[in-house]
Amino acid sequence: MEASITVLLFAFTKVASSLYYEGSGHSDGEIQTNEVYVESRPLGPYRAPRWCYDLHISDGEATCYSPLGPRYRSTLGTRCRLSCDQGFKLIGQSSVQCLSSRRWSGNGHCRRIQCHVLPPIFYGSYHCSVGVSEGSRCDYSCAPGYMVEGDRSRICMEDGQWSGGEPVCVDLDPPKIQCPVSRMKVAEPEKLTARIFWGNPQVKDSADGVITRVFLRGPEPGSELPEGEHVIRYTAYDRAHNRASCKFIVKVQVRRCPDLTPPLHGYLTCSAAGNNYGATCEYHCEGGYERQGPAARVCQFSQNWAGTPSTCTPMLINVNVNSAGAFIDQFFEKQRLLFISSPSSSDRYYRMQTTALQSSGCGLEQRHVLIVELIGESPREVGRVRNQQLSKELIEELRQVLRISRSYFNMVLIDKHGVDRDRYRQPTASEDIFLFIDTYLLSPRELSQVESNKENCD
């Protein structure tokens, strides 16, 4: 009996050994090193049989359930669920069963989850925590002058895809611009303006260094600028249309002297603005007055007038001259002369004329008209101007030079340049004489004075 049992066991062992063939998942003493492998071990006792070899999965876990209980992991009918560690993905079947053929119904292995390599980003870069593995976080940064637009970080997900979208580096930083310093310049002599120059602004783009346009708002360098403050603005644009502006002030200063006071019985004529640096003011006296002092004064850079003020004093008439020309020349640009000649002081025309002029003294003075009388015939002729008497020789020469008749009444009007302007052979109303003077002889300034003082004369 015992011999029979021994023979049967030996025969069963031979049969069992013949079932181990290549590809069956069984081998003598073999340990597989692939990601899912079967550990070779000899068959245990019958009461703890291992029909299939134990499952091992690299970077994962096999959870098995046997009909005989938790102690049995590879008995016939055992089911195992395969899973992978974090960051790995199962390739193959997720559940296998130990079959009667001593094989597992399938196999699987764990592959590391990886995302594709992110493309480079223009004007920037990215840094990833663990490369392209699952869970890796890639943070984007941009070159100086650029900013990230879009997702600043992307994470490699479990499905092997990156979260979010691909960002870009955009130039949002405006260029740097620095204007020239503000400046002030004194207006040029006799001018209310100054020509001012300045350099170009300093412009730099913090991104790619390219400045496309620079605009100027205001006058150009080298412009002739009037008195006051002028704001100069520059605006620069980079290639991304970002802009930056700066401004500075250009000031033109006009140095001025105190206003001059016109002399009594006189007036001033000034160049430029009248009291600015370099302006010249000339003194003038009204008819019948002479200037005492300098003819002009100049406003200096120190804002003071050169010289001393002038005055206007009554004109001194010199009747002790040797010729008619010398007599008339002393009134040059000072007085107009109205010569009245009559054969006698009792002449009717003479008396009518003098009566009319006596009531028009204000009008004559306003128009700078001085009356010179030549009365009578030689040797009893009389000549006078104001309260001064003329010599007989001067009377005779004046009549000859001016071609004035001794035998009848006549008048001659001489302008301030000694030119014969009009003649009268009959008594003439003062208004008619004044109308001729106002129309043809008065300067615009003199006419304005006559109009402004008209009420005083009336």
Curated annotation (Swiss-Prot):
Matches recorded under CDD domains: CCP
Species this chain originates from: Xenopus laevis (African clawed frog)
Protein name per Swiss-Prot or TrEMBL: Sushi repeat-containing protein SRPX2
Signal peptide: 1-18
Gene3D superfamilies: Complement Module, domain 1 (2.10.70.10)
Domain Sushi: 62-112, 113-171, 255-314
SUPFAM superfamilies: Complement control module/SCR domain
Any one cellular-component term (Gene Ontology): cell surface
GO function terms (MF aspect): signaling receptor binding
Job of this protein: May play a role in angiogenesis, synapse formation, cellular migration and adhesion.
Residues of the HYR domain: 170-254
Keywords of this entry: Angiogenesis, Cell adhesion, Cytoplasm, Disulfide bond, Repeat, Secreted, Signal, Sushi, Synapse
